[in-house]
From Swiss-Prot:
Pfam families the record matches: Thymidylate_kin
GO biological process, one term: dTDP biosynthetic process
EC class (word): transferase
Binding site for ATP: G9, P10, E11, G12, A13, G14, K15, T16
Record's keyword terms, sorted: ATP-binding, Kinase, Nucleotide biosynthesis, Nucleotide-binding, Transferase
Protein name in the entry: Thymidylate kinase
Family per similarity comment: Belongs to the thymidylate kinase family.
Record-linked SUPFAM superfamilies: P-loop containing nucleoside triphosphate hydrolases
Organism: Thermomicrobium roseum (strain ATCC 27502 / DSM 5159 / P-2)
Gene that this sequence comes from: tmk
MF-aspect GO terms: ATP binding; dTMP kinase activity
């Protein structure tokens, strides 16, 4: 049984933490897992990640193309093979981050970004996307308080981050079958319980990856 589950949300929402907590529960339940992230997941992806998050500012088009190049390697080398083996794939960010950040945030055409995704991945979309929602100011304050490595995206103006969050809300409303919204302002253990309840409910319903 293969499932492709992604975590999305603004900065400081706790995606990496919740992805790890869900992975632990699924492993305890006996499932085979691939836990990965974007950008990253492959040697090329990790190299691109380091450049994109810490390097000099790039044109929005260049940024989007680099994210998509990393995703192409990631999908064809790791994600698709795992799904074909019947593995559950958990991914910390995926194409929706590109649509939110480079599309809504940077102002690139969403149709163009979707076409890039289609070409790069064979149009592979998640079965379930968990949106960990947190107000922009709260998320950025969490990042600062945790002394996390500050990336170029963290340093964007508040208006940029608000556009990103608004895109996520709109996407979840447009496709409620794929998206589930979880209040990420709650304590991590409460969020983890909500994520677990969501995943088990969706898996019980029977939507699977192609």
């Amino acid at each position: 049984m293969s499932w492709f589950i992604t975590f999305e949300g603004p900065e400081g929402a706790g995606k990496t933490t919740q992805c790890a907590l869900l992975a632990a529960r699924l492993r305890e339940a006996g499932y085979s897992l691939l836990v990965t992230r974007e950008p990253g997941g492959t040697p090329l992806g990790e190299t691109i990640r380091e450049w994109l998050l810490a390097g000099e500012a790039l044109r929005p088009e260049t940024e989007a193309l680099l994210f998509t190049a990393a995703r192409a390697e990631h999908v064809w080398d790791r994600i698709r093979p795992a799904l074909e083996r019947g593995t559950i794939v958990l991914c910390d960010r995926y194409v929706d981050s590109t649509l939110a950040y480079q599309g809504a945030g940077r102002g690139l055409d969403e149709g163009w970004l979707r076409e890039l995704h289609r070409i790069a991945t064979g149009d592979l979309w998640p079965d379930l996307t968990i949106l960990l929602d947190v107000p922009v100011e709260v998320g950025l304050a969490r990042r600062r308080a945790a002394a996390a490595t500050i990336t170029r995206l963290d340093q964007e103006e508040l208006a940029f981050h608000r556009r990103v969050r608004a895109w996520y809300h709109a996407a979840a409303q447009r496709d409620p079958q794929r998206w589930r919204v979880v209040d990420a302002t709650l304590p991590p253990e409460v969020v983890a319980d909500a994520v677990w309840a969501t995943v088990t409910e969706v898996m019980k319903r029977g939507r699977r990856s192609p």
